[in-house]
Amino acid sequence: TSLSTLSFTESANLFAYSISEGGSDWNKIIIRNTQTMKQIDDTLIDVKFSGIAWKGEEGFYYSSYDKPKGSMLSAKTDMHKIYFHKIGTPQSQDQLILGGDDFKRRYLSAYLDEKENYLIVSAANTTYGNEIYVKDLNKKDAKFVAIQTGYTASTSIFKVIENTAYAITDLDAPNKKVIAI
C-alpha cells in the first residue's frame, strides 16, 4: 500500500488522502478529521489519476474513469472525468462536473484558485500540450470557458488575482513565459 495524494482543507479541519494497493493505478480516497483522526465519510473507490481539490469543507473535486468491465489491471480507460464529492454523501451521488466523450484520451485535473472562486481544469494530451477551462463558481449557471485549446502548448495557471489569471506557458515561447489572462 502506498500514499498517492494528500490534501488538507484551507481550515486544516479535514484532510483527504488516496492510497494505492498492490501497485495499481486505481486508488481509494479516505477523508479524516484532523483533530480526532476519525474517518468521516465512506471511502471513495475506483479513483484513477486524480488530485484532490477542496471547496471549503463542503467537499472536493477529483478525477476518475468509469469502472472498467473485466480486469482492473488490463481494461482500457479512455474517458477521464471530474467529479465533485460532497462530504456526508455516498460516492454514487457524486456530481459529474466535466469529462466523457468530449475528452476522450485526455487526462483531466481540477484545481481551485486560492479564494475558491474559480474551478480550473487542465485537459492534458497523452504526449504534449493541454487545454485550459475555467468556471466561475460564484455564478449559479456558469459554464466552462475555454482559455486555451488545441493541445499546441503546455500552460498552467498558477495565480488568480481579482479577475486576472496568471499562467506559465510555452505557447510561442520555447523557454516559457508568464502571461496574464
Question: Model-found features: residue ranges?
Answer:
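Beta-propeller folds
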Residues: 1-181
